[in-house]
């Protein structure tokens, strides 16, 4: 029995270490299968011996439903922060700090160091306080509450897999942090939620203040820690020392923490954080500027509400509420009919927003959105904002949104497939045809120079170009009859259409617009099947054998090439002189062949598509996210969170200049 108990201690220590590698470092040293095997063994031993350590990974998720939240008195106060919304306010605060230090040093022998700050991101989540006892065991987690008294949420916090249940420390400490919901976790939760979450912050706060711990676990929260508010161990001399302690003890901490001494340096870092804000996988709403030296903090002191030695610089909100006026239904290239919300104009992040995304009728019903109601809006990554939910109090007098029964453009009957609506009139529905023709002629497809959506609409309206093959029947004299078409422009378009006939097979496959098939998948298919005929005859088993192609894409390809109308259209293109060929490129031995590369930031010599094509021509796989499988991260100007992740995982980082030198 003693041997089994000893094994429990060993397994708990090992599993906690492996969990830290997996959830915090994102760099697992064992497979999921090996981890599960060890975990199952621990569960078996705990049942057999009755010994369950308080920091065992088996204690993270329980089926418990609590009856109430107990009050918890914090050992150290959780202060609010003073706020600034302009750089002038930050400068005034900085000047006061410098003046206070200079005045102190004039009259004291124990001089204070020159003012230095550490800037960190201001996370937009729920503040939590985790207490570790003298054995390093997590004994309590609590909300901020009043700053002095919060609510105990220990069971809920234990569901956050990045929070260690035990650390190597022999003094009681309280660690302050922010529980957050990542954008990825938010999207995954909302896919299956009966009532979708409205924003990430509410997602995190609602999870931790839920008495049903199982529901907390479903939201898959994360956490970042940034302060030790109570410490019975050796005092810290600087904030930098404190942050190093947090990181060294395996407590999750954001990697971004920059030292600054001047207002110019502070401004530079604030601007940087604001630039990368939308690229992050979680929400931030500002930057925190805190004095580094602890003795200087003592000198500066506190007001009744907040410390004078720290300041929060607040960014403009990325969320707002406004009134939904009407819904406009649009038809895409595939015939899908999708709703767009027309809104009462509102400012979000310095931009006036008048339209927002409504994905489909199912999405509208789940969110409870109605005409005339007030809705929550969220804008991220400079794309069209999305409606996240409705203000319940605004529903009185609102009207239901009704799905159209006929196409808003051609009047054809609409059919429903799953949660989506489609116009099946592929022969004469203007938006479908125009967008299909534009896609066909785009740079990554047939590369017909100077061919815009405006031109496609004009050809549709005035020359009755109703199919892709009609493009190759256009004559110069036809174009000369049109508005805005002079001799030169007409000849240029005819030449561009003619030169597009000699094309490579991957571009042609991509141009055809097979559902779920992008440029990379088109290239992968061509590498496997070599010719158009081979691809048309491909079986399901052959398609799924291609790397990165799953059941859905394989079925899309099968369905596409089993459609007689599509096959007839392809034959027409071939008869008109379009000759797609696959060139098997021999890749010369180079440093990138067979490597996985991630690109972040903007490059001066390459567009995003150009660098992707260049890397692929060298035999590299271009990935969209950084992981332990990444070999290189190519960093341009203003890199995003991928750069930070690469530093964390110790992945080789190369500049644009390095890249050019490496390929010769």
From Swiss-Prot:
Domain (BRCT) ranges: 587-664
EC numbers, comma separated: 6.5.1.2
Enzyme kind, highest EC tier: ligase
Protein source organism: Clostridium novyi (strain NT)
UniProt family annotation: Belongs to the NAD-dependent DNA ligase family. LigA subfamily.
Entries under InterPro entries matching the protein: BRCT_dom, BRCT_dom_sf, DisA/LigA_HHH, DNA_ligase, DNA_ligase_CS, DNAligase_adenylation, DNAligase_N, Hlx-hairpin-Hlx_DNA-bd_motif
Active-site residues, as the UniProt record annotates them: 122 (n6-amp-lysine intermediate)
Substrates-to-products reaction catalysed: NAD(+) + (deoxyribonucleotide)n-3'-hydroxyl + 5'-phospho-(deoxyribonucleotide)m = (deoxyribonucleotide)n+m + AMP + beta-nicotinamide D-nucleotide
CDD domains recorded: BRCT_DNA_ligase_like, LIGANc
Record gene name: ligA
Disulfide-linked positions: none
GO CC terms: cytosol
Keywords of the record: DNA damage, DNA repair, DNA replication, Ligase, Magnesium, Manganese, Metal-binding, NAD, Zinc
The protein's name: DNA ligase
């Amino acid at each position: 029995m003693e041997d089994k108990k000893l094994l429990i201690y060993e397994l708990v220590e090992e599993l906690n270490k492996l969990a830290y590698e997996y959830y915090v470092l994102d760099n697992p040293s064992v497979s999921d299968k090996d981890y599960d095997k060890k975990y199952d063994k621990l569960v078996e031993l705990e049942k057999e011996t009755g010994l369950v350590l308080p920091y065992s990974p088996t204690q993270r998720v329980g089926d418990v439903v609590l009856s109430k939240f107990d009050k918890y008195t914090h050992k150290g106060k959780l202060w609010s922060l003073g706020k600034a919304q302009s750089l002038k306010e930050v400068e005034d605060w900085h000047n006061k700090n410098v003046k206070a230090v200079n005045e102190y040093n004039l009259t004291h022998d124990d001089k204070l160091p020159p003012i230095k700050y550490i800037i960190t991101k201001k996370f937009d989540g729920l503040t939590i306080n985790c207490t570790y006892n003298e054995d390093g065991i997590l004994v309590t987690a609590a909300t901020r509450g009043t700053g002095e008294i919060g609510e105990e949420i220990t069971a809920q916090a234990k569901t956050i897999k990045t929070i260690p249940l035990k650390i190597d420390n022999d003094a009681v400490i309280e660690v302050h942090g922010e529980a957050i919901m990542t954008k990825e976790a938010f999207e995954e939760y909302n896919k299956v939620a009966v009532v979708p979450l409205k924003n990430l912050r509410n997602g995190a706060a609602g999870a931790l203040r839920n008495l049903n711990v199982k529901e907390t676990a479903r939201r898959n929260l994360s956490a970042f820690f940034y302060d030790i508010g109570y410490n019975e161990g050796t005092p810290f001399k600087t904030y930098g020392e404190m942050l190093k302690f947090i990181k060294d003890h395996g407590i999750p901490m954001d990697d971004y923490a920059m030292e600054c001494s001047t207002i110019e340096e502070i401004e530079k870092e604030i601007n940087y954080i604001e630039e990368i804000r939308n690229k992050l996988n979680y929400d931030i709403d500002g930057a925190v500027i805190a004095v580094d030296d602890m003795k200087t903090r003592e000198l500066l002191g506190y007001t009744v509400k907040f410390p004078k030695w720290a300041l929060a610089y607040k960014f403009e909100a990325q969320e707002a509420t406004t009134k939904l006026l009407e819904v406009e239904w649009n038809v895409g290239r595939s015939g899908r009919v999708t709703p767009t919300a027309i809104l009462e104009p509102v400012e979000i992040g310095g931009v006036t927003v008048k339209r927002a995304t409504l994905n489909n009728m199912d999405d509208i019903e789940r969110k409870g959105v109605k005409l005339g109601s007030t809705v929550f809006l969220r804008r991220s990554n400079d794309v069209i904002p999305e409606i996240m939910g409705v203000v319940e109090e605004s529903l009185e007098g609102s009207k239901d949104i009704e799905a159209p029964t006929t196409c808003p453009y051609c009047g054809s009957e609409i059919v429903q497939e799953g949660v989506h609506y489609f116009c099946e009139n592929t022969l004469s529905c203007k938006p479908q045809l125009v967008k299909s023709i534009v896609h066909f002629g785009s740079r990554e497809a047939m590369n017909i120079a100077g061919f815009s959506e405006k031109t496609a609409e004009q050809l549709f309206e005035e020359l009755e170009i109703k199919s892709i093959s009609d493009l190759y029947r256009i004559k110069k004299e036809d174009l000369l009859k049109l508005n805005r078409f002079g001799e030169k422009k007409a000849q240029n378009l005819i030449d561009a259409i003619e030169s597009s006939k000699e094309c490579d097979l991957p571009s042609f496959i991509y141009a055809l617009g097979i559902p779920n098939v992008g440029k990379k998948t088109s290239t992968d298919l061509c590498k496997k099947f070599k010719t158009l005929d081979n691809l048309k005859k491909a079986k399901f088993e052959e398609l799924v054998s291609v790397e990165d192609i799953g059941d859905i894409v394989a079925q899309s390809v099968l369905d596409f090439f089993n459609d007689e109308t599509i096959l007839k259209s392809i034959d027409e293109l071939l008869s008109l002189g379009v000759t797609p060929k696959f060139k098997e490129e021999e890749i010369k031995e180079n440093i990138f062949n067979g490597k996985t590369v991630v690109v972040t930031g903007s490059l001066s010599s390459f567009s995003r598509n150009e660098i992707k094509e260049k890397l692929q021509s060298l035999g590299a796989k271009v990935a969209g996210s950084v992981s332990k499988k990444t070999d290189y991260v190519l960093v341009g100007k203003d890199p995003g969170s991928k750069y930070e992740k690469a530093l964390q995982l110790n992945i080789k980082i190369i500049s644009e200049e390095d890249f050019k030198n490496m390929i010769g």
